[in-house]
């Protein structure tokens, strides 16, 4: 034991540092609220799951979440962040245990530190992102253990576990789960092509795992018929809108992604060629990093961030080693395709959402940790210190974000007139002034929490959450409004619209039997977002107006 601590002292220091930063991260949970985008939307989805008043969306992550965390009120931002962190911490433990089984049971400190490092900064509020990150991380670990094991019953057990995890993924993000199920089944077929009995046994084991998840969802969470109906309902109206969910958008996004990947390959080949012809072994890595930084600086809207480009740096020794030993016939072997699958896992797991690939891939790069450990395990004589430094540099951004957020905490401003959970969140002065101003207007029109209906789009879900309002329609994006079934909407007492919303939805709002805009008073309310916020379009949000039904106004 003494030798282990002596050997892994640097990882002990890393664990202490990560523990301190994680404590700071947890301490920041009740500070700040991103009012412009999805944070309030996800909290409202969790409230919807508790109410079970309606089941909407192609993803049922919210239904799963409230059953996985029965003792936490997930409509609280703090509890939502805590639940998300629990999923990530559980994934770190699963990766650590898997690494011990695959490589060296005595190096648990090392594997825990590296797993924590590779998943550091993930989490945030509970949504489909940390849910998908967790279940696909567990599925990856189960498949790695399946690949490693030689005992039939163990392989079958791991195949069942992999199927269970991918089954949950089917109810979170369907496309990614389907792609991974096909890849896993293909690798099983390729590995046992000569023994069809084992091939059928392992595929059947995976299918049993998926069916067990479906049984759990049907009995514990919600009847499958209701879930499928909700998925088809949402897929129909969102698919018709074509906003980032249509085939052309996916092809364009992945085409631009592979454009960037092509440059990565060229940079990698160039650095590999250079490293074979000079005596300074690390020169190729430096050239690679410089090329990536120059490319991302001058490229217009790169689909991969510089940090994601550089994330592949620790894999260079592994890939160099594989290329040196690779022969043409090796492409026929299942092991070769297994390593290709693990390398491509972050991309495959990111399939199926309209969010940027660079942000999604980062959630699954723990797959690359296993490639790195595999190479290190097979070639222990290599010097990895420079690679460790490179990995630490990659995680400087979340580290700096946590420290900056911790330093800038201000507990002076709270909005206490609406949702009790929102009252516990520390906001900026501008946000509190915004919510107080809007709430004053609402009160002039006899606003009643949990009774008055508000129609809004993505940018104003924060008001629905803060004011405890009834959501008039669950259409989410303004681009989806045209195809959203209007019979499912509640006649709103209040409407939030910015200029872009009015352009997209204006004519249809006039056609609705609500009397808009003639029967509504109009108030300019602006935006609660910071003036220097890079994540919002201020030219659009500064045009935000609140419409209040005239008949509800209090008599002066």
What are these regions (language model features)?
Residues 76-81, 113-135, 171, 292-306:
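Aromatic- and kink-enriched transmembrane "portal" helix at the membrane-lumen/periplasm boundary
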Residues 120-121, 155-174, 180-185, 207-208, ...:
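Membrane-interface alpha helices of multi-pass inner-membrane proteins
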Residues 107, 142-168, 196-204, 280-287, ...:
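Short hydrophobic alpha-helices at membrane interfaces in multi-pass membrane enzymes
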Residues 400-483, 492-503, 538-539:
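Short periplasmic/luminal acceptor-recognition loop of GT-C membrane glycosyltransferases, typified by
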Residues 59, 63, 72-93:
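Loop-to-helix entry region of an early transmembrane alpha helix in multi-pass inner-membrane enzymes
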Residues 1-5, 148, 179-211, 215, ...:
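Perimembrane helix-loop-helix junctions
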Residues 82-105, 110, 138, 272-273:
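Transmembrane-helix motifs of polytopic, lipid-linked glycan transferases
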Residues 27-45, 53-68, 74-75, 224:
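Extracytoplasmic catalytic/substrate-binding loops of multi-pass membrane glycan-assembly enzymes
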């Amino acid at each position: 034991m003494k030798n282990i601590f002596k050997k892994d002292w640097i990882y002990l220091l890393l664990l202490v540092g990560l523990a301190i930063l994680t404590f700071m991260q947890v301490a920041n949970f009740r500070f700040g609220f991103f009012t412009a985008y999805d944070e309030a939307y996800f909290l409202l989805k969790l409230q919807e799951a508790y109410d079970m008043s309606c089941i909407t969306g192609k993803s049922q992550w919210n239904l799963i979440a409230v059953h996985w965390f029965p003792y936490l009120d997930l409509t609280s931002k703090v509890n939502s962040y805590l639940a998300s962190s629990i999923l990530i911490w559980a994934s770190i433990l699963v990766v650590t245990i898997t690494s011990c089984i695959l490589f060296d049971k005595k190096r648990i400190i090392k594997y825990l530190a590296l797993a924590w490092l590779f998943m550091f900064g993930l989490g945030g509020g509970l949504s489909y992102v940390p849910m998908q990150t967790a279940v696909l991380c567990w599925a990856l670990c189960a498949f790695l253990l399946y690949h490693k094991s030689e005992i039939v019953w163990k392989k079958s057990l791991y195949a069942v576990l992999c199927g269970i995890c991918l089954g949950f993924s089917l109810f979170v993000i369907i496309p990614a789960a389907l792609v991974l199920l096909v890849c896993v089944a293909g690798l099983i077929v390729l590995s046992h092509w000569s023994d069809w009995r084992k091939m059928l046994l392992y595929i059947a084991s995976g299918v049993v795992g998926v069916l067990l998840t479906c049984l759990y969802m049907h009995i514990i969470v919600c009847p499958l018929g209701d879930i499928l109906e909700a998925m088809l309902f949402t897929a129909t109206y969102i698919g018709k809108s074509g906003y980032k969910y249509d085939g052309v958008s996916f092809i364009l996004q992945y085409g631009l992604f592979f454009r960037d990947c092509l440059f990565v390959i060229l940079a990698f080949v160039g650095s590999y060629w250079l490293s074979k012809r000079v005596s300074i072994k690390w020169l190729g890595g430096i050239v690679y990093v410089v090329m990536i930084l120059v490319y991302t600086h001058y490229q217009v809207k790169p689909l991969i961030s510089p940090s994601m480009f550089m994330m592949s740096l620790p894999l260079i020794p592994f890939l160099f080693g594989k290329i040196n030993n690779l022969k043409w016939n090796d492409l026929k072997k299942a092991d070769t395709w297994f390593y290709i699958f693990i390398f491509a896992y972050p991309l495959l797991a990111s399939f199926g959402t309209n969010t940027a690939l660079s942000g999604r891939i980062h959630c699954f790069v723990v797959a690359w940790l296993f490639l790195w450990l595999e190479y290190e395990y097979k070639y222990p004589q290599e010097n990895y210190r420079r690679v460790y430094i490179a990995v630490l540099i990659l995680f400087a951004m979340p580290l700096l974000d946590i420290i900056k957020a911790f330093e800038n905490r201000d507990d002076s401003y709270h909005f206490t007139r609406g949702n009790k959970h929102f009252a516990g969140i520390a906001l900026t002065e501008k946000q509190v002034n915004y919510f107080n101003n809007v709430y004053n207007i609402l009160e002039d029109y006899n606003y009643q929490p949990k009774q008055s209906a508000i129609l809004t789009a993505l940018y104003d879900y924060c008001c629905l959450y803060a004011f405890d309002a009834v959501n008039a329609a669950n259409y989410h994006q303004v681009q989806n409004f045209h195809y959203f079934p209007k019979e499912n909407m509640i006649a709103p007492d209040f409407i939030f619209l910015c200029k872009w919303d009015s352009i997209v939805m204006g004519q249809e709002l006039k056609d609705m039997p609500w009397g808009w805009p003639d029967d509504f008073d109009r108030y300019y309310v602006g935006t609660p977002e910071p003036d220097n916020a890079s994540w919002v379009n201020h030219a659009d949000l500064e045009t935000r107006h609140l419409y209040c039904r005239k008949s509800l106004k209090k008599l002066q």
